[in-house]
Amino acid sequence: MAPDSTFVLLDGSRQTTADMKGRVTLVNFWATSCAPCIAEMPRLIATHNRYKAQGFDTMAVAMRYDPPSYVVNYSETRKLPFQVAIDNTGSLAQAWGDVERTPTAYLVNKRGEIVKSYVGEPDFFALHQLIEKLLADTPS
């Protein structure tokens, strides 16, 4: 299962892992100072836009060492279409498996179970196939 977590979004609102149930969600830990994170961002945006109408979400979690002003600036100038949270205490990274390397991502199914984790940029073709499979799954 995905850890019980509360994500504080850039607008100050909160979302929990319980709120994600019923949707397939990619939880992506990243930083504005991480070149591979920035390099994969266009593909994350394209993936989000491709599947969002079918019940897919992306939660981008900025690491605690990433200055919030940088995260806000990047998110606004790039018009990120998904939710962005700031892990200002590092507690989210710790709860999700002591995340230290970025990018690190977790694909969570409709039941709230982590079905795949990625360290580094994922194989987007394989990721898309898995997302489609999970979206087609009816949770019991």
Q: PLM features: what roles do these ranges have?
A:
Residues M20-R23, A53, P81:
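Active-site acidic short loop of glycosyltransferases
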Residues I38-R78, I86-A95:
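Structural microenvironment flanking redox-active thiols in thiol-disulfide oxidoreductases
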Residues D4-T25, W96:
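A short beta-strand-turn-helix
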Residues N73-P81, I86-L135:
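Thiol/disulfide oxidoreductase modules built on the thioredoxin-like
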Residues Q15-I38, L44:
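Short active-site neighborhood of thiol/selenol oxidoreductases, capturing the structured segment around
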Residues L26-N28, A60-A62, Y106-L107:
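Hydrophobic beta-strand core positions in alpha/beta domains
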Residues V24-T25, F56, P103:
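Alpha/beta-hydrolase fold active-site loops
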Residues M1-D4, H128, P139-S140:
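N-terminal targeting signals for export/organelle localization
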